[in-house]
Amino acid sequence: MEQLLDNRYRVIKTLGSGGFGETFLAEDSQMPSNRRCVVKQLRPIHNNPQIYQLVQERFQREAAILEDLGSYSGQIPTLYAYFQSNTQFYVVQEWVEGDTLTAKLKQQGVLSESAVRDILINLLPVLEYVHSKRIIHRDIKPDNIILRHRDGKPVLIDFGAVRESMGTVINSQGNPTSSIVIGTPGYMPSEQAAGRPVYSSDLYSLGLTAIYLLTGKQPQELETEPHSGEIIWHRYALNISPTLAAVIDRAIAYHPRERFTTAREMLEALQLGVVSYPPTVPYQQPQSSPTVPYQQPPVVTTPPFATQTNTVAVSPGTAPTPQPINHNNSNKGILMGSLIAGGLIGASVVIGFALTRPNQPVTQTTSLPSETTISNNDTPTVEPSPTDTPETPISQTVTQDPTPQASVRFPINSRPFTTPIDSKPRNTTEPTTSVPQPTTPSEPQITTPVEATDRPSPEQAVQNYYETINQGEYSTAWNLLASSFQNNRKLHPRGYDSYLDWWGGQVENVDVEQVSLLKANADTATVNARLRYFMKSGRQSSSSVRFSLVWDADNNRWVVSGAR
């Protein structure tokens, strides 16, 4: 016999059933197209007429939230309707044609790192919006993420709030509360299992979902370090990059204070390759969570992706008492970074990288090694501080001290090296004098192609690049990037405009705290740098970046070919 719900929705088949009710695939008989939809039947777990009114009110409130969420994002199913019938509650939502991540893995095996990164990068902006509405999903897992057939986008389904309303009871104080905990064992963290979920609880679940996609292992199949609570999973995913591993590790940290504080922060870490230390400012507990005192870190984002609109903390009116956060376990937070800059919730990511300028007056007198790995201890790590550098005419070469020095801070409106006020434009020729060698007379200036030993060092190229940015000469800095980076639409969706939005609009200053040569030959070089960003918003963040440079013989300079 044909089943018709609410005299409208014709049931095609049952998609699933459980303690809360059943889920059907149905057709809307009152739509000309007989549009397919998902109908979820929910029943209260307590058959108590006294609390039925409370259940009804909470159900209506949560359904309204679902409507709001679905109307914003194409990656959350649209709510078509909700109704009640025979003490049961029904939600009618968009039918998403696609495969769950569980089904996808069963079809083709574990996913590649790039596929998992794409899923995370596409889902985190959705989670950011959900959290901005003070909603915690509470049941993120492979079964609740569908890869839509028509565009391959991940869609987040089955929010837990509506189901939770079915467990409404009256506590001993006479207040309505829920008698059930929403979530899936293994995918939900300890605070959620205790009935105190926070925003980072969703990030924890998403991190474990990523591990499942990379390894094929369910959380219950993974061991846990008994002292720290750390989940041991790296042995099952040996070929993934340290950056992705670090992002996942922070997302699944046992204590919420050690996780990313927001979906935006996790997204930036993925896009930039920068996993920062947890912030030291307290975070306010979301209103939708229970009122047991519990503290989550603040919304602090890591460069270079923050904007005024996407870093607003989502919190209730009453803040918990600020307490410092323990950083003992955060040493694994910072790994390798990439200099990707800019972005949006769906946004642009911009890379700022390094190379030298042909007119730079400071060069390194040591010869550039060929195909040699150089110890950090034997390589100049930073340019000497301005206070330690004697005033030198622009036409003189300064020998760089091979001993690591203090970090150099380049103010926006000042140069780190002393030059005459009426110095020539940036297209001025190279200095024509050089420091004589002790045993041989100075060689005359030559016009033939520059040999490798006369080139500016790759380390100096990194410092010069940030000097250019700190002076606000963004177009010059942009032209110091390799064309492959300029034209990479994943990094610069709008080309130079994306680059300028980040460096000109968000960053106040960048300190080059340390720079060292890893290896080099006549055509390529690899440089490690430690950077500190000073944002116009007042925030600070550090990152470690590994630059790959290639020699641009036409312009006698190093240009960046990669960074991570």
Curated annotation (Swiss-Prot):
Q: Name one Pfam family in it.
A: Pkinase
Keyword tRNA processing found: no
Biased composition (Polar residues) is annotated at: 360-406
Catalytic activity, as annotated: L-seryl-[protein] + ATP = O-phospho-L-seryl-[protein] + ADP + H(+); L-threonyl-[protein] + ATP = O-phospho-L-threonyl-[protein] + ADP + H(+)
Looking at the record, the residues that make up the Protein kinase domain are 9-271
User: What name does UniProt use for this protein?
Assistant: Serine/threonine-protein kinase PknA
Q: Where is the active site?
A: D139 (proton acceptor)
Give a short account of what the protein does. Answer: Probably required for both normal cellular growth and differentiation. Inactivation of pknA leads to colonies that appear light green and rough in the absence of combined nitrogen.
* Span list, region Disordered: 360-458
Molecular functions (GO terms): ATP binding; protein serine kinase activity; protein serine/threonine kinase activity
Composition skew (Low complexity), residue ranges: 428-445
- Which CDD domains does the annotation name? STKc_PknB_like (cd14014)
What Enzyme Commission number(s) does the record list for this chain? Answer: 2.7.11.1
Output the superkingdom of the source species.
Answer: Bacteria
Annotated family: Belongs to the protein kinase superfamily. Ser/Thr protein kinase family.
Binding residues annotated for ATP, in chain numbering? L15, G16, S17, G18, G19, F20, G21, E22, T23, K40
Alphabetical keyword list: ATP-binding, Kinase, Nucleotide-binding, Serine/threonine-protein kinase, Transferase
PANTHER family noted in UniProt: SERINE/THREONINE PROTEIN KINASE, SERINE_THREONINE KINASE LIKE DOMAIN CONTAINING 1
